[in-house]
Amino acid sequence: MQFVLFGPPGAGKGTQAKFLSEELNVPHISTGDILRENVKKGTALGLKAKSYMDKGELVPDNLLIDLIKDRLSQPDCRKGFLLDGFPRTIPQAEALDEILDDINKKLDGVINIDVGSGELIRRLSGRRICRSCGASYHLVFNPPKAKDLCDSCGGELYQRDDDKEVAIKNRLDVYVRQTQPVLEYYKKKNLLIDIDGEKEIDEVTADVKAAIRKLA
């Protein structure tokens, strides 16, 4: 089975991706992993991508699409795949349609882990990091024993700038602007499966599982 996975920062997408990959026995493929792997191996596509990454530039669509096509053509994708981080735009979604046509596959579904902005801000803004050892805590989900102090080394805990509410809102705004048209694209194709990501992790997983079973 072939799926694409969407979810904003803080939605628990990584947890569900791990479950889905194991449940379906298919590889979890993220664009970040593909880029890192090709750069590490020094492939022709990887070297091209590295030339952009070294300059701090975005890897252009045509190169990213070639990398995706190459990865989806690998033997471990014969039984299916879980694609994460692609497509992010309508042209990329259309390119994915063409790739799948070329390899005689089709998407079974597009899973969107949906969480409201208020809950996402609560989840993301609660993170605290130790200045000394880098240990990570969360004021709600994994609080330190003593306020503002690291359990491991006693170092001071602080909130990173990108975990502050204004920065989080900006990240979420960018995510919504970027992905909403793509979600609409898949909704029109009757492929979109919205999952309530505000429930407990086990409940979200159960809902994802139920959605997959309906398609099997």
Curated annotation (Swiss-Prot):
Q: Give the molecular function GO annotations.
A: adenylate kinase activity; ATP binding; zinc ion binding
User: Which of the seven top EC classes does this enzyme belong to?
Assistant: transferase
* EC nos: 2.7.4.3
Example GO BP = AMP salvage
Binding sites annotated in the UniProt record for ATP: G10, A11, G12, K13, G14, T15, R127, S136, Y137, K199
> What Pfam families is this protein classified in?
ADK (PF00406), ADK_lid (PF05191)
The positions annotated for binding Zn(2+) are: C130, C133, C150, C153
Superkingdom classification of source: Archaea
Transport as UniProt keyword: no
Region of interest (LID), ranges? 126-163
Which Cys pairs are S-S linked?
none
Can you say where in the cell this protein is located? Cytoplasm
Q: Summarize where AMP binds, as residue positions.
A: T31, R36, E57, L58, V59, G85, F86, P87, R88, Q92, R160, R171
Determine if Transmembrane is one of this entry's keywords.
Answer: no
What InterPro entries does the record tag this protein with?
Answer: Adenyl_kin_sub, Adenylat/UMP-CMP_kin, Adenylat_kinase_CS, Adenylate_kinase_lid-dom, P-loop_NTPase
Q: Which UniProt keywords apply?
A: ATP-binding, Cytoplasm, Kinase, Metal-binding, Nucleotide biosynthesis, Nucleotide-binding, Transferase, Zinc
State the residue spans of region: NMP: 30-59
Q: Which Gene3D superfamilies match?
A: P-loop containing nucleotide triphosphate hydrolases
* Reactions catalysed: AMP + ATP = 2 ADP
| Pathway noted in the entry | Purine metabolism; AMP biosynthesis via salvage pathway; AMP from ADP: step 1/1
GO cellular component terms, alphabetically, are: cytoplasm
Q: Please give the record's comment on domains.
A: Consists of three domains, a large central CORE domain and two small peripheral domains, NMPbind and LID, which undergo movements during catalysis. The LID domain closes over the site of phosphoryl transfer upon ATP binding. Assembling and dissambling the active center during each catalytic cycle provides an effective means to prevent ATP hydrolysis. Some bacteria have evolved a zinc-coordinating structure that stabilizes the LID domain.
PANTHER family documented for this protein: NUCLEOTIDE KINASE
Task: Tell me the function of this protein.
Answer: Catalyzes the reversible transfer of the terminal phosphate group between ATP and AMP. Plays an important role in cellular energy homeostasis and in adenine nucleotide metabolism.
Record-stated family: Belongs to the adenylate kinase family.
Q: What is this protein called?
A: Adenylate kinase
